[in-house]
């Protein structure tokens, strides 16, 4: 793995009050459309503890990697690692291997987190004792096609009845959208299984629960998700 950025200094458990340092990890492939907005939302977080943003760059065919280089040049908190296969699980594991903080927050390159997301997620980890917390996947489209997909993604008829799609009460769950993890539990479980090209999150959360950990859903954690813009891109996702 080629790392561009500061050398990893190990697992740095820096604390600001009760908040721990966070490594935000993103698997990135062909995210030219949304990458700037996604990373900007992370860098603008209202979070008093230190955090970093690790982009695992796959073999994109658009301007994604150029944009990532620009973001890293402008802000030292942005770190780039190579993910030669471009697969989600591989990229996440590459980013986690580079992470220097004790909390891992997984975000996507076409998703935007709310301004207090990192603070809220970290506080929930402390409050609930869970090993992973997550909330609502708020799908929002801009084009007619994206809006139609977003509507389907918010409906039980479109994607099933998972609370992270349709909402619900806070509490233990089988899985959550994206997730903010205790790094120790994530490493103990072995990280993401790179044999999976789909459902990596569900499978990882299954192993975390098998190890005795709690997965916690809370609707106050909101992530705005922009659906794929074409039928072809959507088909690749599912």
Can you say where each PLM-predicted feature lies in the sequence?
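Acidic donor-binding/catalytic loop of UDP-sugar-dependent glycosyltransferases
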Residues: 63, 109-124, 206
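Glycine-rich, basic loop-to-helix element that forms the pyrophosphate-binding segment
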Residues: 82-99, 120, 176
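Catalytic donor/gating beta->alpha subdomain of glycosyltransferases that bind UDP-sugars
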Residues: 193-238
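Short aromatic/hydrophobic "clamp" motif used to bind/position activated sugar donors
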Residues: 104
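A recurrent flexible, glycine/aromatic-enriched loop bordering the glycosyltransferase active site
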Residues: 140, 161-184, 196-199, 203, ...
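Conserved donor NDP-sugar-binding/catalytic core segment of glycosyltransferases
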Residues: 116-147, 151, 221-222, 226
């Amino acid at each position: 793995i080629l790392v561009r950025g500061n050398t990893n200094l190990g697992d740095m458990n820096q604390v600001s009050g009760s908040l721990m340092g966070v490594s935000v990890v993103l698997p990135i492939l062909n995210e030219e459309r949304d990458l700037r907005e996604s990373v900007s939302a992370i860098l603008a977080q209202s979070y008093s503890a230190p955090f970093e943003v690790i982009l695992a760059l796959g073999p994109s065919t658009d301007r994604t990697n150029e944009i990532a280089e620009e973001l890293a040049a402008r802000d030292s908190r942005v770190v780039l690692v190579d993910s030669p296969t471009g697969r989600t699980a591989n990229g996440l594991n590459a980013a986690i291997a580079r992470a220097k903080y004790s909390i891992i927050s997984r975000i996507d390159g076409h998703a935007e987190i709310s301004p207090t997301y990192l603070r809220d997620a970290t506080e929930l980890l402390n409050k609930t004792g869970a090993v992973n917390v997550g909330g609502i996947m708020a799908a929002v489209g801009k084009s007619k096609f994206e809006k139609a997909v977003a509507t389907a993604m918010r409906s039980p008829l479109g994607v099933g009845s998972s609370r992270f799609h349709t909402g619900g009460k806070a509490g233990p769950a089988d899985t959550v959208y994206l997730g903010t993890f205790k790094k120790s539990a994530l490493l103990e479980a072995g990280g993401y299984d790179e044999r999976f090209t789909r459902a990596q999150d569900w499978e990882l959360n299954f192993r975390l629960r098998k190890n005795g950990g709690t997965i916690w859903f809370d609707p106050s954690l909101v992530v705005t998700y922009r659906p794929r813009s074409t039928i072809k891109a959507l088909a690749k996702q599912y």
